[in-house]
């Protein structure tokens, strides 16, 4: 297996121009494909997950052109639901941001489409979404294991009253919200359980509004969506920088700054993960906000005990930053780490122990006590981009770290390690 050894880093300082947000990129691509008119997306993320969405749209007959660097995309909207001319199988890798929204959108009208993916995708639950779509009339068949992909979709979603469990993944609700306006009837979506990752729902609602569709949000407990609507192209749309990707550079600055400035997000960003900067500030770093940047300057870091449900992806970065904080850090209400690219609670606990931390792994929490001195380790990444990027922070100690399968960052940030090296000074 390929590996990358990072030598100790004495200091980080500089500016990072963030790649486009994965969450925003894939939502915007699908809405542009469903919309009337031509949409030009700029600062689109070029990564594996986005390529899976683009390939799926092409197979569904959507016409688009990409710039040479794949960050500008002109899409000719379909002006309504997407249909395959004949039976079709779409391979979506391990891209939840493609699998979940497409599973819903392709239930409009009549289709015969199979959605499948990598082995890990077949372990990521989708039953709550399927149950909700079936309540709205969709015909969906599990081809292997009940409640998991691959799925056969044969259309039929017309709207009506649907319940969806919000406690596992906000992507199920996102998928329903994006699909419901194009259904022939009105849809009332009721949330069962506690809704996780609410800020990701705000991204969805924000984008739907940009594409001309309004819905009624009743305190995140019920959503009322008028049927028979259509999406309209906003013309040109700039994809925000990826706030989850910003977390590694901001944390690096908190540990070994200097000052690091990330551009492409700022105080008015729609992504909930910008709140990661508030957590660093609470730990002792100095944060400065602009309209299109966030900067972080080193501070004496202290442990925290916090509910991290609102920033599940960026919270992983706090788990490795905790290695450099004084005291025991506890991250709570993070059960949904277990159904991501890997079981992130298990993976994080396992790899933190390798570098010498004392770790308690609970059902939905993790408690981390840093060692006096970090140990050299080979870090398994579990084909999870965030594990690779999180553990790069270990090099901010006086210990090297080896990251196995470093190219797994291609899911969201193909040149992450080059960007980190650019702002790093060797010890």
UniProtKB/Swiss-Prot annotation:
One matching Pfam family: EPSP_synthase
Residues that coordinate or bind 3-phosphoshikimate: 22-23, 27, 169-171, 197, 313, 336, 340
Biological process, per Gene Ontology: amino acid biosynthetic process; aromatic amino acid family biosynthetic process; chorismate biosynthetic process
GO molecular-function terms, A-Z: 3-phosphoshikimate 1-carboxyvinyltransferase activity
Record-annotated active site: 313
Keywords attached to this entry: Amino-acid biosynthesis, Aromatic amino acid biosynthesis, Cytoplasm, Transferase
Record EC number: 2.5.1.19
EC class (word): transferase
Cellular component GO terms held in the UniProt record: cytoplasm
UniProt xrefs under SUPFAM superfamilies: EPT/RTPC-like
Keyword Isomerase: no
Keyword field contains Transferase: yes
Pathway given in the UniProt record: Metabolic intermediate biosynthesis; chorismate biosynthesis; chorismate from D-erythrose 4-phosphate and phosphoenolpyruvate: step 6/7
Subunit structure: Monomer.
HAMAP family: EPSP_synth
Membership in a protein family: Belongs to the EPSP synthase family.
Protein's recorded name: 3-phosphoshikimate 1-carboxyvinyltransferase
């Amino acid at each position: 297996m390929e590996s990358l050894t990072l030598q100790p880093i004495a200091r980080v300082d500089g500016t990072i121009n963030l790649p486009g947000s994965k969450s925003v990129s894939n939502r915007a691509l699908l809405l542009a494909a469903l919309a009337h008119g031509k949409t030009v997306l700029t600062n689109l993320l070029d990564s594996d997950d986005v390529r899976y969405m683009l390939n799926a749209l092409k197979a569904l007959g959507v016409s688009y052109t990409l710039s040479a660097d794949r960050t500008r995309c002109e899409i000719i909207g379909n002006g309504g639901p997407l249909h395959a001319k004949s039976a079709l199988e779409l391979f979506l890798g391990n891209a939840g941001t493609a699998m979940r929204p497409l599973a819903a959108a392709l239930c409009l009208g009549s289709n015969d489409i199979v959605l499948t993916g990598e082995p890990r995708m077949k372990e990521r639950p989708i039953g709550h979404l399927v149950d909700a779509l079936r309540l709205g009339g969709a015909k969906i068949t599990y081809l292997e294991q009940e409640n998991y992909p691959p799925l056969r979709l044969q259309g039929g979603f017309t709207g009506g009253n649907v319940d969806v469990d919000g406690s596992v993944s906000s992507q199920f609700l996102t998928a329903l919200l994006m699909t419901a306006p194009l259904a022939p009837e009105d849809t009332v979506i009721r949330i069962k359980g506690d809704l996780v990752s609410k800020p990701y729902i705000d991204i969805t609602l924000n984008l739907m509004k940009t594409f001309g569709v309004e819905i009624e949000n009743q305190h995140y407990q019920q959503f009322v969506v008028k049927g028979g609507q259509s999406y309209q192209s906003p013309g040109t749309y700039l994809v925000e920088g990826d706030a989850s990707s910003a977390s590694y550079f901001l944390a690096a600055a908190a540990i070994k700054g200097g000052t690091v400035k990330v551009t492409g997000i700022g105080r008015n960003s729609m992504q909930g993960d910008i709140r990661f900067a508030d957590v660093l500030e609470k730990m002792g770093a100095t944060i400065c906000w602009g309209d299109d940047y966030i900067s972080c300057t080193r501070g004496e870091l202290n442990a925290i005990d916090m509910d991290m449900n609102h920033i599940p992806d960026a919270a992983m970065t706090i788990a490795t930053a905790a290695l450099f904080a004084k005291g025991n850090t506890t991250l709570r209400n993070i059960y949904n780490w277990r159904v991501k690219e890997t079981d992130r609670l298990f993976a994080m606990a396992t790899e933190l122990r390798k570098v010498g931390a004392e770790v308690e792994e609970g059902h939905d929490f993790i408690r981390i006590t840093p060692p006096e001195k970090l140990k050299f380790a080979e870090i398994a990444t579990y084909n999870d981009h965030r594990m690779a990027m999180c553990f790069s922070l270990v090099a901010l100690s006086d210990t090297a770290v080896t990251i196995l399968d470093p190219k797994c960052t291609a899911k969201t940030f193909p040149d992450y390690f080059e960007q980190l090296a650019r702002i790093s000074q060797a010890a």
